[in-house]
């Protein structure tokens, strides 16, 4: 994926699109624009189910964390489309810590259109450390866990989401991710 984005010279930050852009609400799409500053493609442009969008130029991919998001919903016995951010904030720790044992701790804080997530002792920590070498993935599309949370956020809010920043602590124990909820 990193090589594809690099070879096609796509420079924009990945945008996770909400379910209204898809025919199947359980699917997901992440849009990577050709240029750094760009607008979000129309619902019509995305629903054509093509890999490349023409207006604006970009690539439409299945998010790496989509299956994990669907597993989160299954574990909770809910559909994130029928929830909201406070519900997600309350239940994501239960899923990741108790149900799936993916992390030792998860904190989710909302500040306006910013969602900050802090994950401690994740089973993905080594993966995150390695993926930092993949500049087109780290901090844009994200690892499967960061991507899964972005998919859950876009379902719960009904709005596009970007991963603004992700960091892993020096001791490799804590992953901090900042998501932005976009207006269309």
Give the positions of each predicted feature:
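Short terminal or interdomain "cap/linker" segment that borders an active site or interface and mediates
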Residues: 116-117, 160-184
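An N-terminal amphipathic alpha-helical segment
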Residues: 52-66, 89-131
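Short, surface-exposed ligand-recognition loops at beta-strand->loop->(often short) alpha-helix junctions
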Residues: 81-86, 140-144
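N-terminal topogenic membrane-targeting module
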Residues: 1-71
């Amino acid at each position: 994926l990193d090589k594809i984005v690099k070879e096609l010279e796509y420079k924009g930050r990945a945008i996770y699109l909400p379910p209204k852009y898809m025919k199947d609400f359980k699917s997901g799409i992440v849009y990577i624009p050709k240029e750094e500053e760009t607008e979000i493609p129309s619902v019509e442009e995305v629903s054509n189910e093509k890999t490349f969008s023409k207006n604006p130029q970009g690539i439409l991919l299945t998010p790496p964390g989509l299956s994990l998001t669907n597993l989160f919903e299954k574990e909770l016995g809910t559909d994130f489309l029928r929830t909201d951010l406070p519900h997600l904030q309350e239940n994501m720790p239960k899923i990741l810590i108790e149900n799936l044992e993916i992390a030792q701790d998860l904190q989710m804080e909302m500040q306006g259109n910013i969602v900050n997530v802090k994950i401690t002792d994740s089973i993905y920590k080594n993966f995150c450390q390695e993926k930092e070498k993949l500049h087109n993935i780290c901090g844009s599309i994200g690892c499967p866990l960061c991507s899964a949370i972005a998919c859950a956020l876009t379902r719960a809010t009904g709005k596009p989401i970007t991963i603004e920043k992700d960091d892993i602590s020096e001791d490799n124990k804590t992953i901090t991710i900042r998501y932005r909820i976009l207006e269309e």
